[in-house]
Design a protein with these regions (language model features):
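Beta-sandwich interaction modules
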Residues: 74-90
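Short, intrinsically disordered N-terminal pre-domain segments
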Residues: 1-21, 108-113
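Solvent-exposed strand-loop boundary residues in beta-sheet-rich modules
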Residues: 63-65, 99, 110-112
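Tight coil/turn sites that cap or link beta-strands
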Residues: 29-31, 69, 75-79
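Noncatalytic modules at the cell exterior or secretory-pathway interfaces
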Residues: 45-47, 85-102
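Short, surface-exposed beta-strand/strand-loop-strand elements in extracellular ectodomains
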Residues: 50-72, 106-107
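Surface-exposed ligand/attachment interfaces on beta-rich extracellular proteins
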Residues: 21-42, 65, 100
Length: 113
C-alpha cells in the first residue's frame, strides 16, 4: 500500500455510492504465454486472483505482461486483491508465469446498474 495523507486540505469531494453485484468466479490457467485473466469490463468494481498452483504468477493491468514487466507477483497459495481505495481499473488484466503453469481462481465484482 502506498502513502496516505491523513491531513488532506479542505476540499469538497463528491462521493457516489456504488452498489456491487455478487462476485463471478472463474478458473483460469497461467502459462509462459501471456493470457487474459479478465477481459475489459466498464462495470468492474473490483477483482481478486488466487494462485492455486505451484509457480509464481505475474499480473499486470494491461494487455502486455512479462516475468520482467509486471505490476504484482502472486506466489503459490497467495491471493491478490485489487486496491479498493483507489480508482477502479476496468481494462484488461493479463497474467504470465516465468516457467511452468499455474491454476488460478479469478473473481470479479461489478457495479449494479
Amino acid at each position: 500500500m502506498g502513502l496516505v495523507n491523513l491531513n488532506p486540505p479542505n476540499v469538497a469531494v463528491n462521493i457516489a455510492e456504488d452498489i456491487r453485484n455478487s462476485d463471478t468466479v472463474t478458473a483460469a490457467n497461467a502459462t509462459t504465454t501471456t493470457s487474459v485473466a479478465l477481459a475489459a469490463n466498464p462495470l468492474r468494481a473490483g477483482y481478486s486472483i488466487y494462485n492455486a498452483g505451484t509457480v509464481t504468477v505475474f499480473v499486470r493491468e494491461n494487455a502486455t505482461v512479462a516475468a520482467a514487466l509486471y505490476k504484482h507477483p502472486i506466489p503459490p497459495g497467495y491471493l491478490f486483491e485489487s486496491e479498493f481505495t483507489s480508482s477502479r481499473y476496468t481494462g484488461i488484466i493479463s497474467v504470465i508465469t516465468a516457467s511452468g503453469s499455474s491454476n488460478l481462481m479469478v473473481s470479479e465484482s461489478t457495479i449494479a446498474a
